């Protein structure tokens, strides 16, 4: 079934930036700005790497994630799935 293979937007986004090693700027709910590349993630946290150091960031602390370059998550370059 197609529904079994479907991923949510968050997992699709994080998996894409992880595989492409896209640099990210992450803003936390307390205003702190983090930058780096996602090397791993699960339901509760992600591992952010920069300058040879890794940070474990809890997702509940994240406000906004901005990729450093334009990304296209879906075929055809559209922002909505078919």
Swiss-Prot record:
One of its GO terms (cellular component) is cytosol. GO terms for biological process: regulation of DNA-templated transcription; regulation of RNA stability; regulation of translation, ncRNA-mediated. SUPFAM superfamilies: Sm-like ribonucleoproteins. Signal peptide: none annotated. PROSITE patterns: SM. GO terms for molecular function: RNA binding. CDD domains: Hfq. The keyword RNA-binding applies. InterPro entries: Hfq, LSM_dom_sf, Sm. The keyword RNA-binding applies. Residues 11-71 form the Sm domain. Keywords: RNA-binding, Stress response. RNA chaperone that binds small regulatory RNA (sRNAs) and mRNAs to facilitate mRNA translational regulation in response to envelope stress, environmental stress and changes in metabolite concentrations. Also binds with high specificity to tRNAs. Belongs to the Hfq family. Homohexamer. This is RNA-binding protein Hfq. The gene is hfq.
């Amino acid at each position: 079934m197609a529904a079994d293979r479907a991923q949510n937007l968050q997992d699709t986004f994080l998996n894409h930036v992880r595989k492409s090693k896209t640099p990210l700027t992450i803003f936390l709910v307390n205003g702190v700005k983090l930058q780096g590349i996602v090397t791993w993630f699960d339901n509760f946290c992600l591992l952010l790497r920069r300058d040879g150091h890794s940070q474990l960031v809890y997702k509940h602390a994240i406000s906004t994630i901005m990729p450093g370059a334009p990304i296209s998550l879906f075929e055809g370059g559209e922002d909505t799935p078919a």
